[in-house]
């Protein structure tokens, strides 16, 4: 009887300790997410625009990748094309994932932009934009661009601009229309975690892009561009 009672007490104490540890970990995780979120919102204040007439003109627009055909992709393409046609960027660097067979975000963006009337000769492809960090840092280290307009949804631009600052890049953002909460809830939740990951990558791990490679000059005299097929 006494042994059974002792086992019950140990079980209760252990359960309470586990619960306390779990609650503490949840509090730490929640605080970390909130801090990372606030840091990136503050870093991008007055550096993003949604009005094509108000955004400053720059030489290169960096269009961040998304799965071809999805709603984020379509809105980013429309926004990048509008920015180009308004004379706010001269060149478009489309950066996306090409790490899987038959999956090529950069070529998909290039073809969609051409369909919107953007000349093929002003589009440059970055096939190694496996993450936002890769896309932003490669824009400087591979394509030699230190003053860029990043094109994506506002939540994405905030993180990209913060990352750009950590790697010494002068970036502003032009915001593509977002989805409503009903359709974009999962993406918004994933973005909160991505902001924590970005802080770890930039501040703790000092991560560099997965691939760098030879330099590519963006401009009329470059031998490189964005062919219809890589």
UniProtKB/Swiss-Prot annotation:
Main location: membrane
Keywords for the protein's UniProt record, in alphabetical order: Membrane, Transmembrane, Transmembrane helix
Positions of transmembrane segments: 18-35
Membrane topology listed for this record: Single-pass membrane protein
Compartmental location: Membrane
Domain of life: Bacteria
Cellular component, GO annotation: plasma membrane
Similarity comment: To E.coli SanA.
Protein name: Uncharacterized protein YgjQ
Organism this protein belongs to: Escherichia coli (strain K12)
Designated gene of the protein: ygjQ
């Amino acid at each position: 009887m006494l042994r059974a009672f002792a086992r019950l007490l140990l079980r209760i104490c252990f359960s309470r300790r586990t619960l306390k540890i779990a609650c503490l970990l949840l509090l730490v995780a929640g605080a970390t997410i909130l801090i990372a979120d606030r840091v990136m919102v503050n870093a991008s204040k007055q550096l993003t625009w949604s009005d094509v007439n108000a955004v400053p003109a720059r030489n290169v627009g960096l269009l961040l990748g998304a799965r071809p055909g999805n709603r984020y992709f379509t809105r980013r393409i429309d926004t990048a094309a509008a920015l180009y046609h308004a004379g706010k960027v001269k060149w478009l660097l489309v950066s996306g994932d090409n790490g899987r067979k038959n999956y090529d975000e950069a070529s998909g963006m290039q073809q969609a932009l051409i369909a919107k009337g953007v000349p093929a000769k002003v589009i440059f492809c970055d096939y190694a934009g496996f993450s936002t960090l890769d896309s932003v840092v490669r824009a400087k280290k591979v394509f030699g661009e230190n003053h860029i307009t990043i094109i994506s949804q506002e939540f994405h631009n905030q993180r990209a601009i913060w990352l750009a600052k950590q790697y010494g890049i002068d970036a502003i953002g032009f915001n593509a229309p977002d989805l409503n909460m009903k359709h974009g809830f999962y993406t918004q939740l994933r973005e909160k975690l991505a902001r924590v990951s970005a802080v770890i990558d930039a501040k703790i791990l000092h991560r560099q892009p997965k691939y760098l490679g030879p330099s590519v000059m963006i401009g009329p005299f470059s031998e490189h561009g964005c062919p219809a097929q890589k």
